[in-house]
């Protein structure tokens, strides 16, 4: 496992855990970003920009360090 802020552009991962302040966790959930979602990193320079459920999101690297993910390597892991 790794943290979201450690992924690079083009990486694909599954969200395992979101360990943030309650208000940030609520914002993630209300935006449709939940444990089990598959994400694709669009850019990891500055903010982390990623795609989840056909939507694009941007979060700070500071917030991204609280999101635990498993990097997916093979297509069949999706």
PLM region spans:
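C-terminal structural segments of small proteins and small subunits
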Residues: 42, 47-78
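Conserved hydrophobic positions within beta-strands
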Residues: 15, 38-41
């Amino acid at each position: 496992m790794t943290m979201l802020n450690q992924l690079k552009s083009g990486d694909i991962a599954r969200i395992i855990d979101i360990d943030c302040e309650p208000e940030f966790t609520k914002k993630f959930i209300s935006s449709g970003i939940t444990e089990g979602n598959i994400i694709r990193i669009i850019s990891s320079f500055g903010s982390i920009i990623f795609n989840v459920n056909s939507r694009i999101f941007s979060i700070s690297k500071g917030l991204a360090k609280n999101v635990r993910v498993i990097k997916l390597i093979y297509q069949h892991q999706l």
